[in-house]
Structure formats: C-alpha cells, structure tokens
Regions:
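Inter-helical turn/loop segments and adjacent helix faces that build the functional surface
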Residues: 231-232, 255, 259, 301-304, ...
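C-terminal, non-catalytic "cap/extension" segments appended to globular domains
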Residues: 114-118, 228, 357, 365, ...
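Long, well-ordered alpha-helical segments
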Residues: 197-208, 213-214, 218, 252-256, ...
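Post-HExxH zinc-binding segment in Zn-dependent metallohydrolases
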Residues: 243, 381-410, 417-420, 424, ...
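Active-site-adjacent "gating/activation" loops or surface patches in catalytic cores
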Residues: 161-173, 283-358, 363-367, 471
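Glycine- and acidic
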Residues: 123-124, 180-189, 229-235, 272-283, ...
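A well-structured
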Residues: 1-280, 293
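Active-site-adjacent bridging/hinge elements
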Residues: 113-115, 218-223, 265-271, 329-340, ...
Length: 563
C-alpha cells in the first residue's frame, strides 16, 4: 500500500483523454445492444477514475505548498485544461440521454446517475470553455493571495490560521486587537478582493447568458446538481431561519453574555467566539498530538471507524498542521485510483480546530465506504448530502472529547460552545447564501452596493452582533473572507441544510446514541444513490424545507443550552 507522498504523478495527456472520451461517445451512439452501451459507460467511468485521481493528487500537493513551483504549474495546467475535459464529459452525457437503453443503464448505475447526467449535460457548452478557464484563473489568484497573506500583529507576522487562534484568546484586549489586525488587512486589500469578485460575477453572468439562461443563479443551481429543491424552497427555508432560528440565537447570545460577564444587549464581534469567562477550553498546540488523539477516538468509536482510521494512518492520507504557504481552509477529497480519501487541515491549536478535524474526517468516512465500488465516481454525493456526513461526525465523536481536553469541565465547555456555534451558523450560512442570490440576480451591483446588501442581511440574520466600529465589519465587507463565495458559488446553503440534519441526529443521540450512530452509518454508506430529500426521508428525519421543521431544532437546542 502506497502512502500519499508516494503516489506517482505524471501530467496527463489531455488530448489523449479527450480523444478517449470522444471514442467512447461514438461507441455509445453506435451501440445497438444494451451491453455495448454499458461497456461504453464502464469505459467512461474508468477514464473518470484516472483523471479525477491524477488531478486530485496535483491539486492537493499544490494546496499543501502553494509556493512549490512544480505543482504551481500543474495547478495552472488543470485550471486551463479542466474545462476542456469537462466539455468532453458533457458530450458523453448527452449521448447517454439520447441512448435507447436507459432502463438497462439505470439497472446497473442507478436512477440518480441519469438524473445527475441531465444536470451535467446542461452545465456547460463549448461557448463558455474560455470563460471557465478565466474563472479558474481568478479563483487561483484569490487562493494564492490568501495562502500567502501576512498579517502584522504585535511585532510579528502571522498567517490567517494564526490570527484565528488569537481571535478566541482569553484576553479580551488581544481578541479585539486580533480582530482589528484582520480588519486592517482586509481594508488595506479591499480593492483586490472587490476586483477579483467583481470579475468573477461578470464572468459567471456572461457564462449564463451564453448558455441562454436568465442569470448565473440558474446556472449555479444546475452546476450544484440541485436535483430535489429550487430557489423557492430555499426561500421557505430562509423564512424559517428568520422566524424560528434567529430569535433562538438571540436568547442564546444573552446567555453567552451573562456567562462571560458582559452586559445584556448586543454581543461584540470579538466576544462572539469567546464562550466562557475563565476562557475557552484548551487543547493540543501540536497537530501531531491532536491527530494521535483523533486516531484513538475513531478506533474506539466503532468497528467501521476503526478500519477507516487505520487506513488513513497507514497511508498518511492527511496533512494536518497549518504552515506558511499552505492554502487556507480545510477539505476532504477522494483519490479513487488509489481507493483513498485525503483530509486537508490547517490545525493551529484552537478548540475549533478539533471540530474541523472531525468534520473533514466525516467526509472521508463516506469516501471510505465507497472506495471499493468503482461506480462511486458516477454517483458522488451531492454536497447537501456530503455535508451531513461531516457535520454529523462532529456530534458523533463528542464521546471522545476527553482525549483532547484535560478536564471534564473543558469537555462540557466544548460541547456547549459547539452547540451554540452550530445554532448560530444556521443564520450565518443562510445569510451567505442569500447574499449570493442577491449578487447573481443583480449582477450590475457595484462593489460598494454589494457591501450595502451584506450589511442589510446582517440586520436580518445577525441582529445580535455589535461590530464596535471595526471598519471591515461595520462596512459590510465580512463576506470577502468567505472563500466559497469566490471559488464555490451556491455551495454554502448545503452546509446549512446538512446542519439541520446533523442536529436531528444529535437530538436522537441525546436519548439513544447507538440508535443515532447506526442511522448515521446507514445514511453514510448510501453515499450519492439518492437525492437529499429522498435520503433524509428514508432515514426517518425531517426535510428542512417543510414549514415548521426548524422550530423543533430551536426548542431542542435551547433546552440543552438552558441546562
């Protein structure tokens, strides 16, 4: 078994890949039997496995060190030629939809495969390849700038993950100064962020126009495989957030203020992630120590998680520590040719980093279950489902928190702060998504007008927040820090929807953990075989678009916070 560092990498021959896909498309069109059609799809699947794997290896190695000149060029290569391969895949998908053997195809690959192919076929045309290449280059520009960001603080130069730790310091003055330092950085570089985002909005809007669509909102939903809900459903969900969740958060924040000895009213932005008067729970400073504890938790949780973490350890399928030049953020990817998940972290020693670790390893748990089935690459979970795997794992691993925190008091603190954070996130995440709808429904907005729209949304979704005249926050620029707005439009609502499902697993687990965990494992094993709505209903949980579905969550969480 090869370790991730040993995976071979050779730049792929894009012309050969496109030619292979073209040949398979011709074979599919000419197929006069179901078996010939299925053979063509199997061939397509195998090309996909190889291409996705080599691209994932290159991208991950680049993200680990964005200063590596070799993988910097490889990342540029995929940004340029990825859309060319995508177009060949779309053409193959169109041939599937025109095929006479749809029942036989569904029998082998599942109904959802055809549903997703229908979305893929509508996701691009030859007219937008050049625009997609430009879009990728703009995203890379944003990511590279963030990865190399240097923030002056108290005579030192810090990275973004480093400043994040200080923003939750026990010392209020340090927290405030850290928020001010981050504000200074973003204000100083505001023109850069505005110009990149403005270019992205114009680019994506032009893509939608060239494809004959009303706006990029419509195209964004297609590209996110929204196979079971619409903007109208999301609008119903938003109203529930405003009516049921925001009032609950406001009550939670009053309790929060009381805990930290601050007067009732709005909470200062630099107190929002400081949950206890005597300090947030303290965990390991070292990423190696953190990972050793995480391995123990997974080995003890269940036979499935034990086998999973043993694979991850043996292959070193993760990179945990934060360092200069590393891409900001965390994610999980799959490398199907090696049957390997890979988890990318930026551990800097905060309690929140522990949660992020379990979140990303939750994604990997799903990849682990699908690793032996080659058809998984054809039916990857849509992101709303994928985020259930990760957000629920945050709760499922709480029984092992004593391995990260020295006292039972700190374990209790971590559980409470995580619960409050997740509740608050429902409103914040919805605000991010609402902002995207406004931006892409009104692409003519200027950067200043976008900031005004964000500030208006703050009043709807975070009326409890006091920005204390810190310029970056007061002027509606906070959205610039949200990477998904730049690199993954219309992704963010998937986190929020998944959080409502994770809360339901948590609620069941408070009464019967084993039942909740087995339900979670069953859902995770199903991967992308069903739509989000169908999977949630099959699991016996409430779909968040249904009116009244969020009231139960608000009541359950508040009851726990009141204990």
């Amino acid at each position: 078994m090869l370790k991730f560092a040993e995976f071979p990498y050779v730049r792929p021959d894009i012309e050969a890949i496109v030619a292979k896909l073209g040949g398979l498309t011709a074979d599919l069109k000419a197929a006069d039997t179901a078996e010939k059609a299925l053979d063509a799809i199997r061939g397509y699947r195998d090309v996909l496995i190889d291409y996705m794997s080599i691209r994932s290896i290159a991208t991950t190695r680049y993200n680990i060190n964005t200063r590596d000149p070799y993988y910097l060029e490889e990342n540029k290569f995929f940004n340029k030629f990825g859309p060319v391969v995508d177009k060949a895949m779309v053409e193959f998908g169109e041939a599937i939809l025109a095929c006479n053997f749809i029942p036989e195809i569904k029998a082998e690959f599942g109904d959802i495969f055809i549903t997703n192919i229908q979305f893929k076929a509508k996701s691009m045309t030859a007219d937008v390849i050049e625009l997609m290449q430009e879009e990728n280059a703009l995203n890379a520009k944003y990511q590279e700038f963030n990865a190399t960001a240097q923030i002056p603080f108290d005579g030192k130069i810090l990275t973004v993950p480093d400043i994040n730790v200080l923003m939750a310091s026990d010392d209020r003055e340090i927290r405030k100064a850290a928020y001010q330092a981050l504000s200074d950085f973003y204000v100083k570089n505001g023109e850069f962020y505005d110009s990149v985002y403005d270019a992205l909005v114009k680019n994506r809007t032009e893509q939608a126009k060239r494809m004959g669509l009303k706006n990029y909102t419509e195209l964004g939903y297609i590209r996110r495989n929204r196979n079971c809900f619409t903007p109208a459903d999301v609008d119903v969900f938003r109203k529930q957030i405003a009516e049921d969740i925001v009032p609950a958060i406001m009550k939670a924040k009053q309790m929060h203020l009381e805990r930290i000895g601050q007067p009732a009213g709005k909470i200062k932005i630099y107190d929002n992630d400081f949950y206890f008067a005597d300090g947030n729970p303290k965990t390991f400073e070292s990423a190696d120590d953190m990972m050793a504890a995480a391995v123990e938790v997974f080995r003890e949780l269940s036979p499935e998680t034990r086998d999973y973490i043993n694979l991850m350890e043996e292959g070193k399928y993760y990179d945990a520590p934060s360092r200069e030049g590393k891409k900001v953020g965390a994610y999980c990817t799959g490398i199907p040719a090696h049957k390997a998940p890979f988890v990318f972290l930026n551990y800097a020693g905060s309690a929140a980093d522990v949660t992020t670790t379990f979140h990303e390893f939750g994604h990997g748990f799903n990849v682990f279950f699908g690793r032996e089935n080659p058809n998984t690459v054809l039916n990857n979970s849509t992101l709303d489902i994928a985020e259930i795997h990760s957000m629920t794992m945050e709760f499922m691993t709480e029984g092992g928190l004593h391995k990260f925190f020295k006292s039972e008091e700190d374990v209790a603190k971590q559980k409470l702060s995580h619960l409050e954070h997740c509740l608050t996130f429902l409103a914040y995440g919805t605000m991010v998504d609402h902002f995207q709808h406004i931006v892409y429904d009104n692409p003519e907005l200027t950067p200043a007008q976008r900031n005004e729209e964000w500030r208006k949304l703050e009043n709807i979704y975070r009326p409890f927040m006091d920005f204390d005249n810190i310029e970056y926050y007061e002027t509606g620029r906070t959205w610039q820090r949200q990477q998904h707005l730049f690199s993954a439009p219309f992704y963010y609502i998937d986190y929020v929807l998944a959080q409502t499902i994770a809360f339901q697993f948590w609620a069941i687990g408070t009464e019967d953990f084993e039942k909740s965990f087995r339900m979670y494992v069953d859902l995770t094993k199903k991967g992308g075989r069903y739509t989000f709505v169908d999977l949630v209903r099959q699991t016996g949980l409430r779909v968040p678009f249904e009116e009244g579905s969020l009231k139960f969550i608000a009541e359950k969480v508040m009851a726990e916070l009141n204990k």
